[in-house]
A protein has these predicted regions:
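Helix N-cap motif at beta-to-alpha junctions
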Residues: 1-3, 181, 210-215
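Helix-enriched interaction subdomains in cytosolic or periplasmic regions
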Residues: 1-15
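Short amphipathic alpha-helices in soluble, non-transmembrane regions
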Residues: 4-7, 188-191, 215
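FabD-like malonyl-/acyl-CoA
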Residues: 22-190
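Conserved alpha/beta-hydrolase "nucleophile elbow" surrounding the catalytic nucleophile
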Residues: 132-134, 200, 211
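Gly/Ser-centered flexible loop/linker motifs
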Residues: 184-203
Length: 215
């Protein structure tokens, strides 16, 4: 733990190419319960997980696991998530587009989560509860002991591949609407085919999906 603390302090001095969206504290732990929240597809970005992978061997183990996994090894998730630096915005856009594809994004997000969980576990931080949004539910189930890391990678790879296959060459889109399902249903009937009620997130938000033109 002391070695990890020293590495964290040392990392604060280095120049980071990406803005950090987290805060690390070495103070005494707070009282109360801890929840881990796992994000879904759409949270991916080029460079995700690179800082941890470069600084901590334990974090790299998750990427090594993915590289040797029968379902994700051929994808080379490490090269997709933190590829060589792009020369210009065109190259960066191409890298982003490749990572955004469902068959890549979902297992890559899983690898990042496994990387983070391994490091947090060694630091002694345990979750009392976990929740996930959409794809993140898979990693929450992994943390809860429902499936091991290899199974989580398998589910992530298969889920992403099946969703990509179902979408085909159709360019889809999603639209969040601040209303309830019963209000939006008659609107969809008037609009006609092409739009469906994909998510009923709650009494004040639904998500519609369909082809970009329909949305």
């Amino acid at each position: 733990t002391e070695s990890l603390s020293q590495q964290i302090r040392a990392g604060e001095i280095g120049v980071r190419p990406f803005k950090a969206d987290c805060v690390a504290s070495l103070d005494a732990p707070l009282t109360g319960k801890t929840a881990f929240m796992f994000s879904g597809q759409g949270s991916q970005y080029v460079g995700m997980g690179s800082d941890l992978a470069m600084a901590f061997p334990l974090a790299r183990e998750a990427w090594d696991r993915a590289a040797g996994h029968k379902h994700t090894g051929r994808l080379r998730l490490d090269r997709l998530s933190f590829p060589p630096a792009a020369f210009d915005q065109v190259d960066f856009g191409a890298q982003t587009q490749t990572l955004t594809e469902m068959q890549h994004a979902q297992p890559a997000i899983a690898a990042v989560a496994l990387s983070q969980l391994g490091l947090l576990s060694q630091l002694g931080l345990k979750a009392d509860m976990a929740a996930g949004h959409s794809f993140g539910e898979i990693m929450a189930l992994h943390l809860g002991g429902v499936m091991n890391a290899d199974t989580a990678l398998t589910v992530a790879a298969e889920r992403g591949a099946l969703m990509a296959k179902a979408a085909g060459n159709t360019k889809g889109a999603m639209l969040a609407v601040q209303t309830d399902a019963e209000t939006i249903k008659p609107v969809l009937q008037k609009v006609g085919q092409g739009l469906v009620l994909a998510n009923d997130n709650g009494p004040d938000q639904v998500v519609l999906s369909g082809a970009q033109e329909a949305v």
